[in-house]
């Protein structure tokens, strides 16, 4: 299955595929998705956890021990916890963000959903998220799952990537367009 989807390839694709197939067989796809989303949010909120995940300085045993404590405190158990500990034991924890992205792509394909990567300057409210989902559903004809990334560098607006299509309505891009137009005119 990993070779069928270009977004699910390499080491992260193999791990994501194995996790997805296990979760599907055990009928816990949604629970694992929720746990991985919780872990992804924890990574975004904790520079120390991010350092633990990315740094080669920590050995596999130290990573697994620290990760076990973090997962217990967060209430992440079962297949999800065992999987994350396996990544640590195999020294592959640094690819966890790519594994989560690939896993979500597999889940979306399984459920007949589309996944859109959305970059915004600041966190969107629930009303705006629902409006964006509705607009994307109207375009694709499928339920759309949003992967939201906050990047203040885009200044305002948003960048939406859905499959091979991308719509960039960020203020940064508009300012760059004006800058290039002024250089050509002057």
Curated annotation (Swiss-Prot):
GO terms for molecular function: proton-transporting ATP synthase activity, rotational mechanism. Disulfide bonds: none annotated. Pfam families: OSCP. Gene3D superfamilies: N-terminal domain of the delta subunit of the F1F0-ATP synthase. GO terms for cellular component: plasma membrane; proton-transporting ATP synthase complex. Keywords: ATP synthesis, Cell inner membrane, Cell membrane, CF(1), Hydrogen ion transport, Ion transport, Membrane, Transport. It is a peripheral membrane protein. It comes from the Bacteria. It is found in: Cell inner membrane. Belongs to the ATPase delta chain family. NCBIfam families: ATP_synt_delta, PRK05758.3-2. F(1)F(0) ATP synthase produces ATP from ADP in the presence of a proton or sodium gradient. F-type ATPases consist of two structural domains, F(1) containing the extramembraneous catalytic core and F(0) containing the membrane proton channel, linked together by a central stalk and a peripheral stalk. During catalysis, ATP synthesis in the catalytic domain of F(1) is coupled via a rotary mechanism of the central stalk subunits to proton translocation. F-type ATPases have 2 components, F(1) - the catalytic core - and F(0) - the membrane proton channel. F(1) has five subunits: alpha(3), beta(3), gamma(1), delta(1), epsilon(1). CF(0) has four main subunits: a(1), b(1), b'(1) and c(10-14). The alpha and beta chains form an alternating ring which encloses part of the gamma chain. F(1) is attached to F(0) by a central stalk formed by the gamma and epsilon chains, while a peripheral stalk is formed by the delta, b and b' chains. This is ATP synthase subunit delta.
